[in-house]
């Protein structure tokens, strides 16, 4: 073997072997247990970042580990290749999104291969290809036929100057990113999929996701947001109109002092006809882009409509206010306001001088609402016939009365809204719907699919090419003129079913059910927790749609989910002559000074600028603190980068990028290489004979098999890859100190190295592949078996016992593994150190914890 570790040479040879032998290409095999390992596929932005590397290294470690368990392992890869960034890049680079995207795919594909990931490249997909989105379009038409798709108007960001829709990220400080025109809200028709039809199942089935993190499950439960309440009808004084309000706290109904409605509520529109102040307020609200998330922090404002609501039980009139904290697209667009028992309502009432009444008090005291609302559940008072009831009794009594009088109904509501899948962008899959000359809207016939997105286009940065090209929309259906839909799908559509397409990527149908049901569900899914409430929910929803279409037979798409943490790096900046921050790459920092705790106190870049250090931050372009994986691979090798990624932190926590840590990982690999080289250079013909081993040799062999047991558990069950690496490093320390004098010495080292290269194979596959063969093993390491623990090697001949005198450790003694209390006590009492500390004392008590501790109490 080569004496020196040369990563670039080794990795090129091993990667060529994998490519030539199609090592990771798999087919269905009913005789083997399958394992489907999947990392969330990347957007082809142009270059991999360290977040990608961490995600894909974790996936590769799991896949390679399962392969050595003898399983039929599928690990595919592809490209989430539609989306707005490609449009922006095309505008900036004066090209079209398609060539920019395909060039990026090729570049990033090469980067992935250089990192040694064991993907089945024969299954590669790109979601921007007609071969992929054709089946998405087909499935959408089937959902439409089942009544799960509908069209309605919804609000979008609208630039009146360019007359175009803007994505949220194209709105900067309320203005168009391109022309700085104030952005308006505009209602336009959009397509929706009825995810709410599956809300209950999506919620209930969270309980079956035993292999998913609790945090993700909690986030999804909250996002779906099931609540039990009452929907009641309020009248409007002086009008024959009514409106509905939903509440989960009907126990507070008797404390309603005003009603708040959305600016877009029909009652607000009516009142605004004679109320200029209200009309102006409505216009202001319509042109703001307030999201649900922003409601909690924004200033609460409102205008009285001049209308009064009639309380459904008391008949009392309460004022109706239009308020900016009520959204028309959430609930009924109206809320009953109980300022005595809701803090937001309390603050609004104080601001506008509205009445505040208390109707709930603690079980064991009085209520004080002079400074804040009392928001806990309690006992009703000031509530007429409901006085004295607790929450549950009041809920039922008030609900029953409303139902009996035809003024309300019990209702289960969900926070979850239907999925709006229309995007007014170009670079996405065209929505396969057409409008006939008579206005009828129908799905594109199957024989006209796919509806192709033209790729040879010019991006002007203003309007989608397929919206600008009036000829593109023209088509014929059954001999009739028709116009195609010019909106494209939300890119979450593509990422909601890609995992299933990998099972049969060349199939001339959406899925080959036999292949899909062999591989699905995914056994291990890996990706960031930021996807908990969007992608991961749509992912689950789409799987249920596929199931109900008869394409898959499982209820959930993935058994286990691992959410890896972010990768952080040092961030530095200086202030330039214009007073602006200039962020400096950590690679361009020339010198640093640190305090006694290792914290950076001073830094200077290569140009001599004194820098401000802001700490460890998420790697990002904005802070210029991203580290190019390719630079690190060229400098240290892919195995070193992979090893650092797995060792530096538990997978679900953030990882702090430290090049000193990378250097440490590199030194470890060189130590392993050196030990193997020294071993191979000797006469290793003597076979291991456990009956001939000395106690020291048995102890070393015990460490080998303890390490096998720990690493197997750490990777296979606990998924604590960092502690698995630490265990192998500790074993390596023992092996480096061990003698290689006798034949049995070397036989144990040989057994240990054979185990170590397999234990590390998932993490540093190139080195392991090479050393496996250099150590004289036949066949490829990919076809070997994971090392098995020899239970007999774990049996200890002796035990190390700690001896305490009056609670302080005074000695450590070695005893036979089966020694009884009397013999241990005798040895302990006769130890020279113990004798010294017992001098002049009388032993009062001796406690023995078998195999661990001998405690002597004396005075």
UniProtKB/Swiss-Prot annotation:
One of its GO terms (biological process) is leucyl-tRNA aminoacylation. A motif ('KMSKS' region) lies at residues 618-622. GO terms for cellular component: cytosol. Coiled coil: none annotated. It catalyses: tRNA(Leu) + L-leucine + ATP = L-leucyl-tRNA(Leu) + AMP + diphosphate. InterPro entries: aa-tRNA-synth_I_CS, aa-tRNA-synth_Ia, Leu-tRNA-ligase, Leu_tRNA-synth_edit, M/V/L/I-tRNA-synth_anticd-bd, Methionyl/Leucyl_tRNA_Synth, Rossmann-like_a/b/a_fold, tRNAsynth_Ia_anticodon-bd. Keywords: Aminoacyl-tRNA synthetase, ATP-binding, Cytoplasm, Ligase, Nucleotide-binding, Protein biosynthesis. The keyword Cytoplasm applies. It is found in: Cytoplasm. One of its GO terms (molecular function) is ATP binding. A motif ('HIGH' region) lies at residues 42-52. It holds the Pfam family tRNA-synt_1_2. It comes from the Bacteria. The keyword Nuclease does not apply. Its EC number is 6.1.1.4. ATP binds at residue 621. Belongs to the class-I aminoacyl-tRNA synthetase family. This is Leucine--tRNA ligase. It comes from Shewanella sp. (strain W3-18-1). The lineage of its organism: Bacteria, Pseudomonadati, Pseudomonadota, Gammaproteobacteria, Alteromonadales.
